[in-house]
């Protein structure tokens, strides 16, 4: 399915709960309060009880991005997506391989689950792709996978904001472009290689921004989130 692009910044900021325990995740959510309404849960937290925590966030009227990056045979993908759709989470990722995406779209039909195709990880650059056996550079591969996600009927894609402008011109206008690797000006890149500031990412055409360490690792998490939201609101809708 497709997803409505939010005009309000609070619906477009997704805070990554990249923490080791449910207790720490609960602390982050409590500290952020009503400032943040959308959270990403990935492998680290899933393996510490994160699926039940995702359900509790949904029950508390928060939105959940389940970042599982699924890739398997069609039937396994379909059965997994069917169960995720019943959880009430808002977004689910899978790798942008055509057969897997088509199976997922069919399995999610009739639900409110927005399926996102992962193009190229923002921690990878052209040298990493060559080492992994790919002949395309990052932008070419991202655009190829974005078009395949479009053709499969996916709700959106996950890609670096560096490629967002080119992607926006290549896919349906209602497709979500969800961008990790968001770093406020002056912050450390960490293990990310293709990064952009919140304002520049929105200008480039991103619909949603994933921010983890700059908020979760900040001394004052709520202040960090509010600063990013202020920057996002200064841009308005891209």
Curated annotation (Swiss-Prot):
Catalyzed reactions: orotidine 5'-phosphate + H(+) = UMP + CO2
Keyword Endoplasmic reticulum: no
EC number: 4.1.1.23
Active site residues of this protein: 69
Disulfide bonds: none
InterPro entries assigned to the protein according to its UniProt record, in alphabetical order: Aldolase_TIM (IPR013785), OMPdecase (IPR014732), OMPdecase_AS (IPR018089), OMPdecase_bac (IPR047596), OMPdeCOase_dom (IPR001754), RibuloseP-bd_barrel (IPR011060)
The entry's keywords: Decarboxylase, Lyase, Pyrimidine biosynthesis
Record pathway: Pyrimidine metabolism; UMP biosynthesis via de novo pathway; UMP from orotate: step 2/2
Cited Gene3D superfamilies: Aldolase class I
Protein function: Catalyzes the decarboxylation of orotidine 5'-monophosphate (OMP) to uridine 5'-monophosphate (UMP).
Known partners and oligomeric status: Homodimer.
Annotated family: Belongs to the OMP decarboxylase family. Type 1 subfamily.
PANTHER family on file: OROTIDINE 5'-PHOSPHATE DECARBOXYLASE (PTHR32119:SF2)
Name of the protein in question: Orotidine 5'-phosphate decarboxylase
Species in which this protein is naturally found: Brucella abortus (strain 2308)
Gene name tied to this protein: pyrF
